[in-house]
Amino acid sequence: MLDDQIILGFETSCDETAIAILKGDELLVNTISSQVDIHEKFGGVVPEVASRAHAEMIRNIFHASLNSANLQISDIDIVSTTDGPGLVGSLVVGYNFAKSIAWSIDKPFLTVDHMVGHLAAPLIENRTMKPPFMTLLVSGGHTQIVLVEEWGNYQLLGTTIDDAAGEAFDKLSRFCGFGFPGGPAIQKIGEGGDPNKIELPRPKTKHEYNYSFSGLKTAATNFLNNLDPNDKLTKADFAASYQEAIVDSLLSNFVKAVNETGVKNISGGGGVMANSRLREKMNIFAENNDLNIYLPTPKLSTDNAAMICVAAQNNLITNDINIDDVRLSSIIT
């Protein structure tokens, strides 16, 4: 029974080396080692540097996680890992390490799509979330509106045609020298600022549910380049206005999709879902329309391995398994 089985999960798709251990509904360990300090001086994630850091840290983090859970490696029943999308080098480090663990203890090895992990993240702390529901997945590399009719039945209604929302935050933050990652930096600088101080565009696309953020980024940089030196605009007002434009754009299409499909359950995930303004407006929309809303905590919105464990567990329950549930040693000759 899955209630008693211990699932070990790995997440190394970008710049977090994350390992989690799940037993039934109980999250025993959720370790996240961030590389923000490493990449900050570059103004963004450098793929080769990220993969090297994963390789250097993953072994120690694995043993520390086992010790924290008071477990032996032989206690693990299932091993799971992210298999993409993400940075290839980073993914390879986690995939190979996880697969070697599964092989060494002769246990099933399951792969999980990174975005399905974000989609399942609310389940970590709230097992009442059930389909059908509409989810808004917003990360550094992806912006998606997904209708979940049943577990394993995911209908992509909208996506970005250029930059993702996370990229829009990061690129402008780099341009302004606000810091990295861009989303948290802009949110912090914008605290107390007037979100309506600057009129920035809310880009539209030909497809009603798709997104485009490159034009917003360009409009914001052009605004700054043409700013009168005597203008008394504050950093807080500018950051708050830019953040508001991104949040409004995200919610505009999402609200339309929810209203047109008539779903009564909504959720969200991805690193940008940690943004306090986006969460606030999502909750207001749910309250005003009598919708059930399921959001992971800000910490569980960003990349973590707990979501990989839960997604793997959910895939097993619903029989939506990415690869055959086999013991690797039985197929290695």
What are these regions (language model features)?
Residues M1-Q5, V112-M134, A311:
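Conserved phosphate-binding catalytic cores of ATP/NTP-utilizing and phosphoryl-transfer enzymes
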Residues L2-P85, H118:
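N-terminal beta-alpha supersecondary unit
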Residues E16-L22, T135-L137, T143-L147:
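Short beta-strand scaffold segments in enzyme catalytic cores
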Residues Q72-D83, T261-M273, Y294:
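Short glycine-rich phosphate-binding loop at a beta-alpha junction
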Residues T111-V112, I266, N283-M307, N322:
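Conserved phosphate-binding/catalytic loops in two-lobed NTP-binding clefts
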Residues H118-A120, P296-T333:
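Glycine-rich phosphate-binding/hydrolytic loop that grips phosphoryl groups
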Residues R127, E150-G192, K217-N226:
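Glycine-rich phosphate-binding loop plus the immediately following alpha-helix
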Residues K188-I266, N275-F285, N289, N315-N319:
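A contiguous, well-structured pocket-lining segment that forms one wall/lid of small-molecule binding clefts
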